[in-house]
Structure formats: C-alpha cells, structure tokens
UniProtKB/Swiss-Prot annotation:
Motif Nuclear localization signal in this chain: 141-148
Region described as Helix-loop-helix motif: 148-183
Organism: Arabidopsis thaliana (Mouse-ear cress)
Quaternary structure note: Binds to FHY1 and FHL. Forms PHYA/FHY1/HFR1 complex. Homodimer and heterodimer with PIF3. Do not interact alone with either phytochrome A (phyA) or B (phyB), but REP1/PIF3 complex binds to phyA and phyB, preferentially to the Pfr forms. Forms non-functional heterodimer with PRE6, causing liberation of PIF4 from the transcriptionally inactive complex HFR1-PIF4. Repressed when bound to PRE1, PRE2 and PRE4.
Induction, per UniProt: Twofold induction by far-red light and 14-fold suppression by red light. Up-regulated by abscisic acid (ABA), heat and salt (NaCl). Follows a free-running robust circadian rhythm, with higher levels during the light phase.
Function in brief: Atypical bHLH transcription factor that regulates photomorphogenesis through modulation of phytochrome (e.g. PHYA) and cryptochrome signalings. Suppresses the transcriptional regulation activity of PIF4 by forming non-DNA-binding heterodimer.
Gene name, Swiss-Prot/TrEMBL: HFR1
Domain of life: Eukaryota
Name of the protein: Transcription factor HFR1
C-alpha cells in the first residue's frame, strides 16, 4: 500500500509539473503573440509590410489599422495666403516629388476655427492636388483690385488739382475740396459783378484767386466783402455773353492772348449750350490797371 501511495503521489506531482509547464508555455506564447502584434502594428504604421501580407495583418491587428486610417483622414492641407490671420510658417511637408508644391500639415481637431483647405483627392501618383478655394482668398483678391482702382483714381485727381504734392488720400481730398471751394467762389464773384466769362481756359495758379477777385471788384467799383454771398452757382445762360460777330484774333505779343469782341451786347441765345471758361488773372489785372 505504501508503494502504491508513493507511486500515486509521484504521478500526481508529475501531472502537476506538466500542467505548470504547459501553463508557462501558453503564457510565453501569449506574450510572444502580444509582442508580435505590437511589432507588426509598428511595421504597418511605418510601411514595412508588402501588399501580399495585407490580408494577414488585417486579421491580426484591425484596431491599429483603423487608427492609422483615422490619422490619415484627420490630416488637412493648409495653404496660407497673404491675407491669412494664422502664422503657419512651420511644419512644411512636401507631398509631391516636385519641391515647389509645399503645403502646411495640421490636424483638423487642433483648432477648427482657423481657415484650412481640405484635400478632395489625394492620390499618391498625382502630382497636383484638387483643393477648394476658401472665401477668404476671394475676398482678399477683390479687396486688392478695389484698392488698385482707388489708387489710380487718386493719382488722376492729384494730377488735376494744382499744387497737390502729397500722395495720401486725406491730403489729396483736402486739396480737392479747397480747390473746388475756390472755383465756386470765383463763379459767384463773376456772376455778381457781371463779367463776361467767355474766355479761353485760364492759367490760374492755386491760391491766386484773391488777387483776381480784388482786381475784378476794383475795376467795377465794388467791394468784394459786400458781394461774397452764399448764393448758388448761376448757370452759364444767365450771364451776359457777347455774340460771335466781329471776333478778332491778336497777332502781336503786346496784345492780350485771349479772344476779344467789338460789341459788348449780350446774346445768350447765340451761345446756347456752351459752357464758359474761367478768365485769366493776367487779363483781369491788366484790365484793372487800365481802368484805374
């Protein structure tokens, strides 16, 4: 009996030992399979697998493959423009073989409020990307064209206004307003004193209107301060205009360089539709000196 018991105890111990060895073997195999799974996942992430091993890998670690696909889908291509508020001047990645196609790589979950352009078709074989133009770029191009047109108009206005040497918009507009006020004052004074405004285009300098108005008023015996009334501009047909009869053209240098008439009678019907020109300061000053 004792021998049988000893033999049974020895067999039981052997069975327990074999079970322990089997458990250790299963644990080591499980650990090796976990390590292989992790290594295979890292290899898949870095592109070490061939196309023939794709099906086997998808059966081994499907979770890692999904994470890699989601990471690829979350990446967006950001093309900065000159009007963009974001300073994306780092993390440049070249997606094509040519070096001139450079885009900025970002994750779309990082800050969704910033402007980005999503890649619509990202084939590895294609060199160019089909992308959607944002509204910010379109607005920036429209604003640029509008600013260029405004700059051209301001340059033309600066050329029309005398003694306007500054190029900024505020200075040009101030000079233009002042110049238009001076022209309005000249028209009002001419209509008040009854001077014939039919002359050639004037050679008036900017700022010489005071001398001209003083000469006009002195020639007609009027006080300029008493006749500067804020009346509206009088049309050209209400002014006494000379007829077209007996118009003589001067030939000598001592005579006036403007048209003269022999009859001071007024005939507005003969000049219907014509716009009068501003008189010259030299003509008015010489006329005033002769009258004095």
């Amino acid at each position: 009996m004792s021998n049988n018991q000893a033999f049974m105890e020895l067999g039981w111990r052997n069975d327990v030992g074999s079970l322990a060895v089997k458990d250790q073997g299963m644990m080591s195999e499980r650990a090796r399979s976990d390590e292989d799974r992790l290594i295979n996942g890292l290899k898949w992430g870095y592109g070490y697998f061939d196309h023939d091993q794709t099906d086997n890998y998808l059966q081994i670690v499907p979770e890692i493959h999904k994470e890699v696909e989601n990471a690829k889908e979350d990446l967006l291509v950001v093309v900065p423009d000159e009007h963009s508020e974001t300073d994306d001047h780092h993390h440049i990645k070249d997606f094509s073989e040519r070096s001139d196609h450079r885009f900025y790589l970002r994750n779309k979950h990082e800050n969704p409020k910033k402007r980005r352009i999503q890649v619509l078709s990202s084939d590895d074989e294609s060199e160019e990307f089909t992308r959607e133009v944002p509204s910010v770029t379109r607005k920036g191009s429209k604003r640029r064209r509008r600013d260029e047109k405004m700059s051209n108009k301001m340059r033309k206005l600066q050329q029309l206004v005398p003694n306007c040497h500054k190029t900024d918009k505020v200075s040009v507009l101030d000079k233009t307003i002042e110049y238009m006020k001076n022209l309005q004052l000249q028209l009002q004074m001419m209509s008040t004193v009854g001077v014939n405004p039919y002359f050639l285009p004037a050679t008036l300098g900017f700022g010489m209107h005071n001398h001209m108005l003083t000469a006009m008023a002195s020639a007609h015996g009027l006080n300029p301060a008493n006749h500067m009334m804020p009346s509206p501009l009088i049309p050209a047909l209400n002014w006494p205009l000379p007829p077209f009869t007996n118009i003589s053209f001067p030939h000598s240098s001592s005579q006036s360089l403007f048209l003269t008439t022999s009859s001071p009678a007024s005939s507005p019907q003969s000049l219907h539709g014509l716009v009068p020109y501003f008189p010259s300061f030299l003509d008015f000053s010489s006329h005033a000196m002769r009258r004095l």
